[in-house]
């Protein structure tokens, strides 16, 4: 699953879930994804007149002239729970990216090009749509600052914006003569009232050491060593996947991501987990033992205020200047609770850095889950071809996505999807962030490109694979584009590079063959992936984002390799493999540096029908043949009683 080259606002999520019982834990756990029955988007306008009137009353009572409603939750999560979908509630717009700002006379909603059509359908007459990226249309920050002139107060819930973003916007507003102010109560929550969904309270499960590879005690010890190096008083863990990883726990509070609502505070002598205790079964409490203090989720702000005061007083007596560490994604509210910028040092999260370097157990888990997942994808593609070509079936894009999920569910340790499947036919495949919706999506066309970007959560790893197929006769341009993308995918996978190289530096390798033809794609080439955690994981990645120039790739990183090519209104192509960074042998070691390379773990054939053999070198053909041989050897055992898939797999993996 790709990340856009230009950073987008955080994704919102579906507003409902389906209860289910996981066979892999002793307690009921919801799936990590929205039900297929809930995929349809209601495009009807919501009358927001009353909601806005109530919000403006609250604004007036609190002397707020302008109120900002971002998409994010308190943890800057990519996906959010229904109770945190405040922007969707106040505006009626349910797209995954957007920012709402309300004044006493106006209301504006900013979103990007993926959602212009949806926003126009869903926003009522109370709202002005700011089309992000269109010439002469201001950003929501610029629009807000312009409205703040003349001493107006701009309010925001400080728990849903980062401290860094708050500083930047406060400066813009100040230059216009306004004031940016933290409003501790979330005013949209007050308007929402009793209709607001409850915060999820699903049970937490243990991620055993046989999957995690390392005990949580050792992880906390490693974090304390980092605190000692930085001479820090402690670290506040605010990202949900970081808390889950640090304590070897998983949850199901957020769709697609096996995390739970929580914070953690680690000091040189204490470790406290902030979570609703009723979410912790006895086995989880036994797992944590007496080394971890459990405190209520809501107690975090009061506790860090008291703790920071206590530690800073002791710090003053020692006449040493130490600060609390927070990640650069921590909220403004946490920053304020800890005493503000003078007492807080923002940094790239040391927990996030450690999490991105998988240990040998996690790496082996990634290998194994990708074999099972590859078998599921081959079964799906064989079934789909048979349905379309032999049975002349009529299937829409969601039918395909649902069938793939059904097949994945049969495999060991399946826990849910890792994101909503992108099942796209023809022109829809050219929409980079396409999401099929029942009742709105297209019928799969056997005479057109079919792009499937999908992934799953397993107890031993997280998968994300994209394959592009054609079931009949592709055009010459489709074959050429596919082969150029495939060449770029292979070039990146096969590169050897010195330790210290960044994903920013490697990005061009995947684009080189497209560039030679004057072609390109408008998204990043790769993103980090968690181990039974979030499918998008920082801080590493491959692309032109500034952050990818700041962090070098390291042994144990798992990252996607997914170049593509898209022609609007016609077709789209993307090929995505998951690769792991490993040390490699080279004849020389310039500067005595180790050299690194990639190991592929994705086990799904490329599409023979789309490969233009004339564009491949003999070396590239050998690479594909070796890969296909490995795919067949590792996945064919799943099809002893499935002649259809086995024949398809033999055909697709036959030597060139």
Swiss-Prot record:
Gene: ampp
Naturally occurring in which organism (per UniProt): Pyrenophora teres f. teres (strain 0-1) (Barley net blotch fungus)
A family per Pfam: Peptidase_M24_C
InterPro entries reported for this sequence: Creatin/AminoP/Spt16_N (IPR029149), Creatinase/aminopeptidase-like (IPR036005), Creatinase_N (IPR000587), Pept_M24 (IPR000994), Pept_M24B (IPR033740), Peptidase_M24_C (IPR032416), Peptidase_M24B_aminopep-P_CS (IPR001131), X-Pro_aminopeptidase_P (IPR050422)
Name this polypeptide is given: Probable Xaa-Pro aminopeptidase P
Catalytic activity: Release of any N-terminal amino acid, including proline, that is linked to proline, even from a dipeptide or tripeptide
Cellular component per GO, a single term: cytoplasm
Residues holding Mn(2+) 2: 453, 464, 576
Molecular function (Gene Ontology), one example: metalloaminopeptidase activity
Sorted UniProt keywords: Aminopeptidase, Hydrolase, Manganese, Metal-binding, Metalloprotease, Protease
Primary role: Catalyzes the removal of a penultimate prolyl residue from the N-termini of peptides.
EC nos: 3.4.11.9
Keyword Cell inner membrane on entry: no
């Amino acid at each position: 699953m790709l990340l856009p080259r230009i950073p987008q606002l955080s994704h919102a999520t579906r507003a409902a879930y389906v209860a289910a019982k996981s066979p892999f834990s002793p307690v009921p756990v919801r799936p990590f994804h929205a039900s297929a029955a809930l995929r349809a988007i209601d495009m009807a306008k919501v009358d927001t007149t009353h909601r806005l009137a109530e919000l403006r009353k609250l604004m007036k009572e609190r002397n707020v002239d302008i109120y900002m409603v971002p998409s994010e939750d308190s943890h800057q999560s990519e996906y959010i729970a229904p109770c945190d979908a405040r922007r969707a509630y106040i505006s009626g717009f349910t797209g995954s990216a957007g920012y709402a700002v309300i004044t006493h006379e106006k209301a504006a909603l900013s979103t990007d090009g993926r959602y212009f059509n949806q926003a126009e359908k869903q926003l009522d007459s109370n709202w002005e749509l700011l089309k992000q990226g269109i010439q002469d249309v201001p950003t929501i920050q610029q629009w807000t600052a312009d409205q703040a002139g003349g001493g107006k107060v701009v309010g925001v819930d400080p728990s849903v914006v980062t401290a860094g973003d708050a500083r930047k916007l406060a400066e813009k507003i100040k230059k216009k003569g306004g004031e940016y102010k933290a409003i501790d109560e979330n005013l949209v929550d007050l308007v929402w009232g009793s209709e607001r969904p409850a915060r999820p309270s699903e049970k937490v499960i243990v991620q055993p050491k046989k999957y995690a590879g390392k005990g949580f005690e050792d992880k906390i010890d490693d974090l304390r060593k980092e605190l000692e190096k930085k001479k820090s008083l402690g670290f506040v863990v605010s990202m949900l996947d970081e808390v889950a990883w640090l304590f070897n726990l998983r949850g199901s509070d957020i769709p697609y991501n096996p995390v739970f609502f929580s914070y953690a505070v680690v000091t040189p002598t204490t470790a406290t987990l902030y979570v609703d205790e009723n979410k912790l079964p006895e086995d989880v409490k036994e797992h944590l033992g007496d080394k971890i203090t459990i405190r209520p989720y809501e107690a975090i702000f009061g506790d860090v205020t008291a703790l920071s005061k206590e530690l800073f007083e002791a710090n003053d007596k020692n006449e040493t200047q130490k600060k609390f560490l927070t990640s650069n994604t921590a909220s403004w509210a946490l920053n304020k609770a800890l005493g503000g910028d003078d007492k807080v040092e923002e940094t790239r999260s040391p927990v996030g850095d450690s999490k991105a370097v998988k240990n040998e157990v996690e790496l082996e888990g990634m290998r194994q889950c990708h074999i099972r997942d590859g078998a599921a994808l081959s079964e799906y593609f064989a079934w789909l071809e048979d349905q379309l070509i032999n049975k002349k079936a009529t299937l829409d894009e969601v039918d395909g996505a649902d069938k793939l999920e059904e097949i994945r569910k049969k495999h060991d340790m399946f826990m849910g999807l890792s994101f909503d499947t992108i099942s796209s036919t023809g022109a829809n495949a050219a929409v980079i962030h396409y999401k099929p919706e029942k009742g709105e999506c297209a019928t799969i066309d056997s005479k057109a490109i079919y792009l499937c970007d999908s992934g799953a959560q397993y107890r031993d790893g997280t998968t994300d694979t994209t394959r592009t197929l054609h079931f009949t006769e592709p055009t010459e341009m489709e074959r050429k584009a596919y082969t150029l993308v495939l060449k770029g995918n292979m070039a990146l996978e096969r590169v050897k590079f010195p330790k210290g190289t960044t994903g920013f530096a490697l990005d061009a390798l995947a684009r080189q063959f497209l560039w030679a033809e004057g072609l390109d794609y408008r998204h990043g080439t790769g993103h980090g992936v968690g181990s039974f955690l979030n499918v998008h994981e920082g801080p590493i990645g491959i692309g032109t984002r500034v952050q990818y120039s700041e962090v070098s790739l390291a042994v144990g990183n798992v990252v996607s390799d997914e170049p593509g090519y898209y022609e609007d209104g016609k077709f789209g192509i993307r090929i995505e493999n998951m690769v792991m960074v490993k040390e490699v042998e080279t004849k020389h070691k310039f500067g005595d540096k180790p050299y690194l390379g990639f190991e592929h773990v994705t086990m799904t054939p490329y599409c023979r029908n789309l490969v233009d053999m004339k564009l491949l070198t003999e070396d590239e053909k050998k690479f594909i043949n070796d890969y296909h041989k490995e795919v067949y050897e590792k996945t064919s055992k799943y099809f002893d009683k499935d002649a259809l898939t086995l024949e398809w797999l033999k055909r697709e993996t036959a030597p060139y």
